[in-house]
Amino acid sequence: ISNNYDLTQGQTLVIEKFSNIYTTRDITSENLTIEQIRDASLDEIKEISNMSYEILFNSNKEVWSNYWNDQNIVIEGNDYDQLAIRFAQYHLKVMTPSHDNRCGIAAKGLSGEGYKGHSFWDTEIFILPFYTYSKPEIARKLLEYRYLSIGGARKKAKDNGYEGAMYPWESAWLEDGEVTPVWGAVDIVTGKSTKIWSGFIEQHITSDITFAIWQYYMVTNDEDFMEKYGYEIMFDTAIFWASRLEWDEIKQRYHINEVIGPDEYKEHVDNDAFTNWLAYWTIETAINYYNKLKE
């Protein structure tokens, strides 16, 4: 498409471009053909092309105004701290798929393509508490994502000789299972690709998810969620850890050997404190709730 314009000195030409994005994975596109999705996209473009930039801008402005009025955090102090919390809240808002429980939060958010948009333990430990306390309905959807992808966790446990649910270190689409790359960048010393061990032995994410479920339940008392999703995840992750433990006959105790803890620079660790404690907590918590439910 080409156009020619003759402008006089000082005259301004304004070009407005309207675009939208539709994918076959959108909830509204689940039962549509490619042609139907294309037509829906074009229909929307035709509709908004009749609106001015000001109308669309004000519509966007209203959405953000409602957000800040609803969830604004005010820090009494220097402006930098207020800017920092605003910056964090902005990214939490734009990178959270709050409309769709089939998606998790990408580790890099929308700031880059690092980790290919995969979800890590960052969601449950660092991000979820914000929503648990401010927007529990969004926190629930993020936890539902873990339930909807439990099939991949069960498959990973089985493939590794364990029972229950062993959650992937990196998660993507619901049926994908473990998506952590096996090989990374070339080591400048050896000249060979570096093996990425986290997908194999960084296993604390299984407990991280259960802890997040428990925390959400403690704050919201959402029994409906627990009965539909929470208890099942809790019990399956406890079963995994019970099968993962290694008995030491000499010392008469269990070990969890060959793991990576939160410090990813330390690989092949035996009895990492963080991993061990949360594994113990997961089993203990599951037993307590099992006994309560029996009553």
Predicted regions and their residues:
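Contiguous, well-ordered alpha-helical segments that form the cores/surfaces of helical PPI scaffolds
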Residues: 86-93, 113-117, 121-132, 197-216, ...
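Acidic/histidine-rich catalytic neighborhood
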Residues: 240-295
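Helix-terminus loop motifs that line ligand-binding clefts
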Residues: 96-111, 137-211, 217, 224-228, ...
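Well-ordered alpha-helical scaffold segments within catalytic/enzyme domains
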Residues: 69-74, 91-94, 125-136, 209-223, ...
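Solvent-exposed loop and edge beta-strand segments that line ligand/cofactor-binding
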Residues: 77, 111-121, 193-206, 263-276
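Acidic/polar, glycine-enriched structural segments that form the non-catalytic walls/loops
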Residues: 1-115
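Non-membrane alpha-helical structural segments and their capping/turn regions in soluble enzymes
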Residues: 82, 136, 140, 207, ...
